[in-house]
Amino acid sequence: MSLINMNLMLAFTMSLTGLLMYRHHLMSALLCLEGMMLSLFTLTTLTILNTHFTLTNMIPIILLVFAACEAAIGLALLVMISSTYGTDYVQSLNLLQC
């Protein structure tokens, strides 16, 4: 395993632990999710380039599309929640209210 792959896996695990530790704030959770998607994108791109497996060239592009959709939905929810409740604490949301 090369040093670049180990660094990317370390970045993914750091983002995952950040997501688990800072799940109380929506903005921190979204940033950790973006870090995970960025490391996954780079890892899949490097793996495809190293193996010369041409049938899976579209996988990084599909991953970028999912990351962009996740970011757009996450930011829309963040704006809606922060304008409604005045904070981005996930614990302050009561999902049972109408």
From Swiss-Prot:
GO biological process per UniProt: ATP synthesis coupled electron transport
Listed GO CC annotations: mitochondrial inner membrane; respiratory chain complex I
EC number(s) given by UniProt: 7.1.1.2
Catalytic activity of the protein: a ubiquinone + NADH + 5 H(+)(in) = a ubiquinol + NAD(+) + 4 H(+)(out)
Assembly behavior: Core subunit of respiratory chain NADH dehydrogenase (Complex I) which is composed of 45 different subunits.
Family: Belongs to the complex I subunit 4L family.
Domain of life: Eukaryota
Protein name, UniProt field: NADH-ubiquinone oxidoreductase chain 4L
Membrane-spanning residues: 1-21, 29-49, 61-81
GO MF assignments: NADH dehydrogenase (ubiquinone) activity
InterPro entries: NADH_UbQ_OxRdtase_chain4L/K, NUOK/Mnh_C1-like
Protein role: Core subunit of the mitochondrial membrane respiratory chain NADH dehydrogenase (Complex I) which catalyzes electron transfer from NADH through the respiratory chain, using ubiquinone as an electron acceptor. Part of the enzyme membrane arm which is embedded in the lipid bilayer and involved in proton translocation.
Keywords (A to Z) from UniProt: Electron transport, Membrane, Mitochondrion, Mitochondrion inner membrane, NAD, Respiratory chain, Translocase, Transmembrane, Transmembrane helix, Transport, Ubiquinone
Record-linked Pfam families: Oxidored_q2
Topology of the protein relative to the lipid bilayer: Multi-pass membrane protein
Annotated compartments: Mitochondrion inner membrane
Species this chain originates from: Platanista minor
